[in-house]
C-alpha cells in the first residue's frame, strides 16, 4: 500500500514566522550543522514527530503497530519471530536497535520546552519511567538533557502510544514552540524523550536480536554462539556501534528491565 502525505502535515503551520525560520537555516548552514540548511528535513522531522501515526492508511488498514524502514538499510539477522506479536504479548510500546547522542546545536530549547510541559502535566510522567536515559539528574526539576536518544530510523512501536492524549499534547506543545523550524528538532529526540518520560521502563525494548545497519552505524548481536555460529546473523559483532563512546546502549541496558543482552 502506498499513500500521500496530507499537505497540512508537510507545510508550515500558521504560527510560524517563515522569515525567522529562513534566517535560522542560513545561520545553521554557515555553522556547518548537519541538515541545518534543509527545509525539507525540518518538515520530515515534524511529520515523523507528530503526524505519521495519523496517516489515513494507518486507520484504513486498522494498524496497531508499525515498523519504520528507511531506504538503503540492511537487516543482517534472520527475523524468525513476529515483532508485533512480541510487542503485544510483552506489553511493549517502543522498540529500537541503536541509540546515540544528538547534536546539541540542533535542539537548544527542546529540553526546556519539555520541562515546561512536564511541569504543566506532572500526571503524565510514568511512575516507573526511564527518565535516567535522557537526563543525568535525579529529578526533572533543574535538569539538563544528556542528549541520548533512540535512533528513530529503526523503530517498532505501538501506534496507540503516539495517538494517546499524553503524547499528542506533548507534540502540540513542542509544535507551538516552533523549534522544528526555528531550531532543527529531530523526531528521534522527540520520540525518545516522550517514551522515556511517558512510558514505564518495561514498555521500551532493545531489539538486540535484530542486526541492523543504517550508514554510518550498525547494531550486531554480540553473542556469537547464539547468533553467529549457527548462521543466523551475517554481521560482525566487532563492527557494532553498541560499545562506541557515542552510543547510549550501555546506559539503556543499565536501566532496562531486561538488562544487558546475553
Feature roles, as predicted:
Residues 1-63:
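Active-site-proximal specificity loops/subdomain of glycosyltransferases
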Residues 11, 16, 112, 247, ...:
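Short linear interaction motif-like sites in intrinsically disordered regions of transcription factors
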Residues 59, 73-234:
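Catalytic core and acceptor-binding pocket of nucleotide-sugar-dependent glycosyltransferases
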Residues 6, 11, 63, 107, ...:
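Acidic, low-complexity intrinsically disordered regions
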Residues 63-64, 72:
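Conserved acidic residues
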